[in-house]
Swiss-Prot record:
BP terms from Gene Ontology: tRNA methylation; tRNA wobble uridine modification
Entry keyword set: Cytoplasm, FAD, Flavoprotein, NAD, tRNA processing
UniProt family annotation: Belongs to the MnmG family.
Subcellular locations according to the entry: Cytoplasm
Annotated binding of NAD(+), by residue: 274-288
Annotated source species: Ralstonia nicotianae (strain ATCC BAA-1114 / GMI1000)
Function as written in the Swiss-Prot or TrEMBL entry: NAD-binding protein involved in the addition of a carboxymethylaminomethyl (cmnm) group at the wobble position (U34) of certain tRNAs, forming tRNA-cmnm(5)s(2)U34.
UniProt xrefs under Pfam families: GIDA, GIDA_C_1st, SAM_GIDA_C
GO cellular component, one term: cytosol
Annotated residues for binding of FAD: G13, G14, G15, H16, A17, G18
Gene: mnmG
Name of the protein described by the UniProt record: tRNA uridine 5-carboxymethylaminomethyl modification enzyme MnmG
Length: 647
């Protein structure tokens, strides 16, 4: 049957990508339908019970800055919070949280069920409605046809998923859930380039059978307890609990090696490539043969369950081998496994077939987000989902697509990497992937993106008001520090030395003094009995005041580095956004090698910047493209001229 209501946007899948996509489109005022095979699994954490980490936490902050749900849901469900790399520079500091699976999922579902313009429907999708070269809807397993002006696919590991435990395997999207076999077949009919990847998960352990007395506790940060969202508060957090640490040993490794002849990875049963930076335990033992021990973190799955997640023991070995390797580790000698570990193979679709908006180049109105694009991780999925939802909404509204630049957001780095370079293994975000990471910090994600989010329609009034209060406070106090001057007459050496290490010899602004190593905003404000402190607190809420202080201190201390990076962005960006026509005939560009012509024709980059990052495209080739565009050929279709270009 044809459903009687036509929607603006349909989102297929209710994981981390799908939920953010649906919420974003609905916040923009689009009539949105989220189709999921099971409403009870909306927002489910399929693998590890944690959010964030290096690079990943940055993405979560960006999703939050654009009004997304992940950070606030983590604040409501987080049972341990830590700042990683806290002793290092601000660019690589990252928030990580352990989450109670039940509380996190409940927080996401609550937002979905109470979001205006968003409807939910429980049915697996088996087909897409395509008319000409455009998608116009989706068909569920019982034949219900839903029509829409845009469709966002966020199918995760469900597309033709196959689960492996030892040499046994069966179809499934994840343990306990069916695979999306028909939908995968339909996408293949559309001739979209695709491949196979794999990921895995460890066995889960009954905490009642763990001997914690011999294990090392790893508590979270307690003074202060971090929050994830820019709107987060510590009183949102449930009870905080520790993780625990154990280690593999030579016996563990011997057990694994002896079982490799029954491993689907090492017997050729699994064809998909797994994530390099989250390897299975058998892969670790093989790749790092010289190491006699690996650290394993025992992470609680929640406050109302005894289930523990042994982070670092992802495996698809046979169950008897899993049991032996778990029992070989200290504190786990008598552990009971609640769920076996497994590997899962699934289809992904080459992200080089997507525009920067995450819309398919081949099928109009069809957007892809999450693991279907070859990424791994909740955070990468959520960020893509948010962007796909925004761009689906913009398309419905007849507006131009939006994608952040590489110098503007980790989300921009993620998308640009995917659409220009593609993937040969599951893609994970790291701070090292960003050229401009000093400007792309967790602490300033709101300063980078919230105003854009407001213009796009995904940032509500409460977030916008909070952002403006923070931005104004940072600006006001920064200007005060720059305009408040001290000299030796009013700041004697005896008062200066405890804070500055020595007396001052000339006039300085407070901002000048704050730039010095080991001088903090707090110590500066305490100088001479608080003489230089602001008349009023930076904010009424202590947490907000701390965020403002951090922004001020980083902005002043790293001003020179950030300014140099901004100059580099401007220099490199002169031709970054110069458009390349969709029907560009690269054979007409004199001097381009056949290899370069073929690669450009295959990838169809939208801009000079994208073209420059395709493997094998040399700076000389980019120069030839620019010369060709400046000549105004291609039947009058040229990219926008940069400043100073001839007419």
């Amino acid at each position: 049957m044809l459903y009687p209501v036509e929607f603006d946007v349909i989102v297929v899948g209710g994981g981390h990508a799908g939920t953010e996509a649906a919420l974003a489109a609905a916040r923009m005022g689009c009539q949105t339908l989220l189709l999921t095979h099971n409403i009870e699994t909306l927002g489910q954490m399929s693998c590890n019970p944690s959010i964030g980490g290096i690079g990943k936490g940055h993405l979560v902050k960006e999703v939050d800055a654009l009004g997304g749900a992940m950070a606030l849901a983590t604040d409501e469900g987080g049972i341990q919070f830590r700042i990683l790399n806290s002793s290092k520079g601000p660019a690589v500091r990252a928030t990580r949280a352990q989450a109670d699976r039940v509380l996190y999922k409940a927080a996401i579902r609550h937002r979905l069920e109470n979001q205006p313009n968003l409807m939910l429907f429980q049915q697996a999708v088996e087909d897409l409605l395509v008319e000409g070269d455009r998608v116009v809807g989706a068909v569920t397993q019982v034949g219900v046809r839903f029509r829409a002006r845009a469709v966002v696919l966020t199918a995760g590991t469900f597309l033709d998923g196959k689960i492996h435990v030892g040499l046994n395997n069966y179809t499934g999207g994840r343990a306990g859930d069916p695979a999306a076999v028909s939908l995968s077949a339909r996408l293949k009919e559309l001739k979209l380039p695709q491949g196979r990847l794999k990921t895995g998960t460890p066995p889960r352990i009954d905490g009642r059978t763990i001997d914690f007395s011999v294990l090392e506790a790893q508590p979270g940060d307690l003074d202060p307890v971090p929050v994830f969202s820019f709107l987060g508060r510590t009183d949102m957090h449930p009870r905080q609990v520790p993780c625990w640490v154990t280690h593999t040993n030579e016996r563990t490794h011997d057990i694994i090696r002896a079982g490799l002849n029954r491993s689907p990875m090492y017997t050729g049963v699994i064809e998909g490539v797994g994530p390099r930076y989250c390897p299975s335990i058998e892969d670790k033992i093989h790749r790092f043969a010289s190491k006699d021990s690996h650290q394993i973190f025992l992470e609680p799955e929640g406050l109302t369950t005894n289930e523990f997640y042994p982070n670092g023991v992802s495996t698809s070995l046979p169950f008897d081998v899993q049991l032996d390797l778990i029992h070989s580790m200290r504190g786990l000698e008598h552990a009971h496994i609640l769920r076996p570990g497994y590997a899962i193979e699934y289809d992904y679709f080459d992200p080089r077939g997507l525009k920067a908006s995450l819309e398919s180049k081949a099928i109009g109105g069809l957007f892809f987000a999450g693991q279907i694009n070859g990424t791994t991780g909740y955070e990468e999925a959520a960020a893509q989902g948010l962007l796909a939802g925004i761009n689906a909404g913009l398309q419905v509204q007849g507006k131009a697509a939006w994608t952040p630049r590489r110098d503007q957001a980790y989300l921009g780095v993620l998308v640009d990497d995917l659409i220009t370079r593609g993937v040969t293994e599951p893609y994970r975000m790291f701070t090292s992937r960003a050229e401009f990471r000093l400007s792309l910090r967790e602490d300033n994600a709101d300063m980078r993106l919230t105003e854009a989010g407001r213009d796009l329609g995904v940032v509500d009034d409460a977030r916008w008001d909070a952002f403006n209060r923070k931005r104004d406070a940072v600006s006001r106090e920064t200007e005060r520090l720059k305009s408040t001057w001290v000299n030796p007459a009013i700041l004697p050496a005896a008062d200066a030395e405890p804070v500055l290490g020595k007396g001052i010899e000339r006039e300085y602004s407070l901002a000048d003094l704050l730039r010095r190593p080991n001088v903090t905003y707090e110590s500066l404000m305490g100088m001479q009995g608080g003489k230089y402190a602001p008349d009023a607190p930076l904010a009424d809420e202590p947490l907000l005041a701390e965020q403002i202080r951090e922004q001020i201190e980083i902005g002043i201390k790293y001003h020179g580095y950030i300014a140099r990076q901004a100059d580099e962005v401007e220099r490199l960006g002169a031709n970054e956004n110069t458009r390349l026509p969709a029907d560009f005939d690269y054979k007409q560009v004199r001097g381009l090698s056949i290899e370069v012509q073929q690669k450009l024709a295959q990838h169809k980059p939208e801009t000079i910047g994208q073209a420059s990052r395709i493997s094998g495209i040399t700076p000389a080739a980019v120069s030839l493209l620019l010369v060709h565009l400046k000549k105004g050929v291609l039947r009058g279709k040229v990219g926008p001229r940069s400043e100073g270009e001839a007419a």
